[in-house]
Amino acid sequence: MSITGQPHVYKKDTIIRLKPLSLNSNNRSYVFSSSKGNIQNIINHLNNLNEIVGRSLLGIWKINSYFGLSKDPSESKSKNPSVFNTAKNIFKSRGVDYSSQLKEVKSLLEAQNTRIKNLENAIQSLDNKIEPEPLTKEEVKELKESINSIKEGLKNIIG
């Protein structure tokens, strides 16, 4: 059985395998499947689950802050909140008083469009500054050979 087939946690240079949780008949409670049913095993399982959830949450926060879905001041690459954050609030409020939020979305879209246009202009100006690479000796030799072959072909055609 592979390690990915069962719950596990990566720690420094080791993989800690977790015992899988099985659902009880009551949907609100879980049964911890362990060899010994004591409180320490349950505490260990909860600590492992807490670590998994914590790492997942931190990862989601970092991804959201990187793509501008939320602002994380501790992350240097975090972008300012974008249109998506305001759109999320519109869905949360279930459409109640959405006109003010739509105005915010419109202003955010306009601001992002101007940023995108500025970036496109900057990219275009940088593209114009790039000089073509100089020809190598091999390329010059190949070009000379192809021109000579064209000349020979023309001589054969014209006579």
Curated annotation (Swiss-Prot):
Pfam families for the chain: Cauli_AT
Q: Which family does it belong to?
A: Belongs to the caulimoviridae ORF II family.
**Free-text function comment from the UniProt entry:** This protein is involved in virus transmission.
The protein's name is Aphid transmission protein
